[in-house]
């Protein structure tokens, strides 16, 4: 496994906050303006955000809007493009682990990102992913360079 240019805690937090501001806040406001109901009770908004989190990285080379703005993206641990299964594991299964452990999984992720050289969190380990600063194609170039050095 060749982890290349891993992204740390603060940049990942910034990307998550940007995603919340850019995606969730407008959805909440639109829902509230249209229905007059409390948007926090809406399964529709939860479903839209869930689909956004799973599908967009598959079709946009590992980027979500916040990650793209911050220059980071999600890749498989071998540097390849994420798949539906990968994102399902990363979002749904890891989310269930965080819920079942009453937040202890989240604390474990914070510790992992602080102490691991590859900056992989619990949801990265579950899904076989990591978050990188590398642009699409850059990992392959780095892998080719590493092979040439070893020859």
Swiss-Prot record:
What's an example GO cellular component term for this entry? Answer: plasma membrane
Q: Which domain of life is it from?
A: Bacteria
Q: Which residues cross the membrane?
A: 14-34, 45-65, 91-111
Pfam families xrefs = RDD (PF06271)
Q: Output the InterPro entries linked to this UniProt entry.
A: Pra-immunoreactive, RDD
Which cell locations does it reside in? Cell membrane
Membrane protein topology class? Multi-pass membrane protein
Q: Which keywords does this Swiss-Prot/TrEMBL entry list?
A: Cell membrane, Membrane, Transmembrane, Transmembrane helix
Question: What's this protein's name?
Answer: Uncharacterized protein YckC
Give the organism's phylogenetic lineage.
Bacteria, Bacillati, Bacillota, Bacilli, Bacillales
């Amino acid at each position: 496994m060749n982890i290349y240019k891993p992204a740390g805690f603060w940049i990942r937090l910034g990307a998550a906050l940007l995603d919340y501001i850019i995606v969730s806040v407008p959805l909440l406001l639109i829902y509230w303006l249209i229905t007059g109901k409390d948007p926090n009770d809406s399964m529709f908004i939860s479903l839209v955000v869930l689909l956004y989190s799973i599908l967009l990285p598959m079709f946009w080379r590992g980027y979500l809007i916040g990650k793209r703005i911050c220059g980071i993206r999600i890749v498989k641990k071998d540097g390849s493009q994420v798949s539906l299964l990968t994102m399902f594991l990363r979002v749904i299964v890891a989310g269930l682990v965080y819920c079942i452990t009453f937040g202890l999984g989240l604390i474990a992720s914070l510790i992992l990102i602080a102490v691991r050289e590859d900056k992989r969190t619990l949801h990265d380990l579950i899904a076989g992913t990591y978050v990188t600063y590398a642009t699409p194609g850059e990992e392959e170039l780095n892998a080719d360079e590493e092979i040439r050095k070893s020859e």
